[in-house]
């Protein structure tokens, strides 16, 4: 849906209205809430956190007409950042989350600060170089089926090759 609307003609304002009419904007708050519900499931929590963090960060960084994500509810965003902080506090090891977070934080730390990111989270994000993902082999198939997170990282890594 987003791809077809992006290809459409019109000003950014018109594209924004098209996305609004499509109902796409209304779906992302529910998607992020569904990820939040998975935070307590040991088998799904790690991926749910990565996807939710990405969506919170991306919604703060890119205009809705570019990302397809309208502003998310503050309470939902805070719940995501609180869970991320809790994982860091518990010392959960996740190299992929580390280099993803370093990139997000380097590109837009304010998105984390806005929703209650702590100094502990800042230290964690800064422990990996901002461009640390460039030194990691990111297999394209590891990004498949991961929604906007996968599409974003696929495009970013393709541009780096």
Name each model feature, range by range.
Residues 72-77, 116-135:
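TPR/TPR-like (Sel1-like) alpha-helical repeat modules
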Residues 64-72, 112-116:
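Short, flexible/disordered intra-domain loops and linkers
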Residues 21-43, 47-48, 52-54:
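Non-catalytic substrate-recognition and accessory regions of acyl/acetyltransferase enzymes
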Residues 159-161:
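Alpha-helical solenoid scaffolds in eukaryotic macromolecular assemblies
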Residues 1-16, 41-66, 92-110, 133-138, ...:
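Amphipathic alpha-helical repeat scaffolds of TPR domains
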Residues 31-34, 83, 117-124:
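Alpha-helical solenoid repeat scaffolds, predominantly canonical TPR units
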Residues 19-34, 69-82:
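Helix-turn-helix repeat elements of alpha-solenoid scaffolds
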Residues 36-43, 87-93, 127-129:
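Solenoid-like repeat scaffolds
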